[in-house]
Every structure is written in structure tokens, then in C-alpha cells.
């Protein structure tokens, strides 16, 4: 076996010699999505870790290794290896790494009572990796595999049928507002969903000023962990442009997709950023970038699978109507919008409103399908969440003054769908108003973003 590969394996696993699996493990901030990884440690299935670029996937893996060690797992039963710097991309490299670990490191081999844990990063660089993981799954019952890659599109595309039924796909998104606050050292108590309880714990009052002061910064910077304390904002823009946007469009996607003009795709992203939270028609966008509608539609699909963009559909019982009706565009993180459009904390109210609605949609769509609603008369509701009892309509008005007319779309939606309660999200107002038999709950954006 190549001595350089052995040396790289050993260097990548400082926990074997009694050190932490990575530097600064003591300052890693707990995250819900990362905690979820550990909950799959005892399951037979492979765990495929996906998520946007720079969202914290590798940190999540390191944190999971540390938590296993804290649980009493022998460090020599854990392996971390990243394939981004290996000279060969052949499947034999992956096989050699696993064989060396099992045969030379794991004490007394992997058993049911003492399994071994593989954490394989940048797995997309290895040819035919799904087949190798399938073979490990089928022949090494006591070896648990976690695999991830910075190119989530490449990883998801590679999974194919080989790992069907053999793998869980866990997404680590960019930071939620709650996680962003935790990164800044602001601990917020658990707050229930506003549709079940409008009250917040009394202890929240101790941090409310810090929370409201941090909100604009979160909207403008977005949720990329490495930008939380980055200054000035122009550096944040440069980081997102170079480390996320350029890397995905000009590198990751070219390895997995047929893209004739990546510069046009970046132009399309910029147009989508200017329209985030608004309705769009692909036939109207395509001519602006000198592209056929069919090509633009293909690029949109690729951007969505690359976790840079998402399509929001009109809330209707008919999936045929849903597919044919107009849609709304949302970029996957508000930091992408700011980087593409050059927004900062002095951004005007219209742009902040777009960021606010994008943040609300992205937050809610993490845990539930999310739609918008528009009727033939032009009445609209920004976000609709399906619910067993009745759908939950939510309107965003990121402003300080609220009028009954702001709830017009909510009232119409409730009349059509038999709801008796709706939600109006504002910049800083809270309370309630009744319009006929409909109760409109008014709440500030931070309240929505912090609910658990």
C-alpha cells in the first residue's frame, strides 16, 4: 500500500493519538442538523450528508466523531478521511483506506457490540463510489458509514439506484437565525410555534434587545458559519461569491452537468436574486439573458438541485394546476442575494423586505412543505403551510406600520379555505386584530424565525 496514503490516513485522524479529531473542537456551536447525524449512528444504513457549499458539513462530521468519543467509543474505531487531495480518483483508493483502517487500526476488528465508524468526506471525487459503499454495506455489517461531499449535487446524483434503501440523506443547511445567534454567543430559550402558542418564555426578555439588533445583520449576511463575525460586509460578499457561487457554478456543476455557458447561469442567478420572493415566468426571464426558455428551465432545475435556489408553488389541490400556474423564486440563503446584488445593513426597506420574506420561507420550508397562494382575482398570500386541521396562511409585511388592508389576501384565503386564523409577520409589531370571524395574529419576524 502507498506509504503516502498511509501517512495521510494517520495525519487525518489525530484522535488515534489522544488529540481531538479537529482543531477548535471546544468552540463548535451545537446545531440541530448536526445533532441529527448522531441519532443515526446506531442504524444499519449509510448516512449521506448533503447541504449547500460552506454550510458546515465537515464541521458536522467532526462534531459527530467527537460525540462518539464522548459516548465512550474507542478513538481507533473512528476514521475520518477526505478524498479531495488524493492523487488517484480510482475506486481502489477508497478500498485501500477502508482496508487499512479495519485491518491495522480497529482493535480486534469491528463487531456488533463494538462497530467501526467511517467518515468519508469529498466522496464524489472517487470513481464509482456508490458501488464501493454498497459493497461495504453488504459485506461489513459492523461498519457504519457516513459520507459527504462539498458538491451535494454530485453526491446526490451519484447515489442513484445503488444505495436505494441502503442510505439516509441528511441535509445540513446554512445557519438558522437561532443558530446564528448561538454563534454570536446569544442563547435563546425554546419558543413554541406561534400557531400553537403565541407566548414567549419570560427569560427571552433578557436577550430580546440583542436578538432584534442582530436580525438585520442575519438577513444581510445570511447563514454561512464562517461569515458570522466577518467584517466588513464587502468581505462577506467576496467570500460568498468566491467560495460558494463561483465554486458551484464554475466548478462543481461542470463536473456533473452539461452546461454550455456557466456565465449565463450566473447571470440567471443574479436575476433570481433580484426577484427572490416574487412570482416569475421562465419565458419572461430567458430573453433577458439571451437564452432559450428550454435552456433556462434546465438551468433552473440544476440550480435547485445544487441547493442555490428553490421554486415555490401555488397552493392548490390540483397538482396539474400547480405545475402550470406561476411560481415564486427563492434563493436558498439571504447571503446569496446580498452577495449578488451588493446589499448591506443600510439597504432600503424594499430590499430588506425581500430578504425578510426569503428568510421566513427558507426557515419554514426546512420542516414543512411551503407554498404561496394567488387566486384569479390577484389576491395573494406569501406563505401557506399545509396542516391537518386547516392550512396556515402567513403574510409578510416587513414594516413598522400595519393596516387592515395588509391582511386582505389573508382574509380572502381564509374565506376560500375555511380558516379562522391567519398570521401577519411584521418588522416589530405584535398583537392581534379580528376581521369578521377571522383572527389575524400579528408577530415580529424574529418570533417566526426563532420558533422550534
Language-model regions, residue ranges each:
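Conserved catalytic segments around the Walker B and adjacent sensor/switch elements
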Residues: 70-85
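A cross-kingdom feature that marks ATP-driven nucleic-acid transaction machinery
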Residues: 1-22, 27, 50, 59-60, ...
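Interdomain motor-coupling "hinge/lid" segment immediately C-terminal to the ATP-binding subdomain
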Residues: 4, 8-9, 158-265, 269, ...
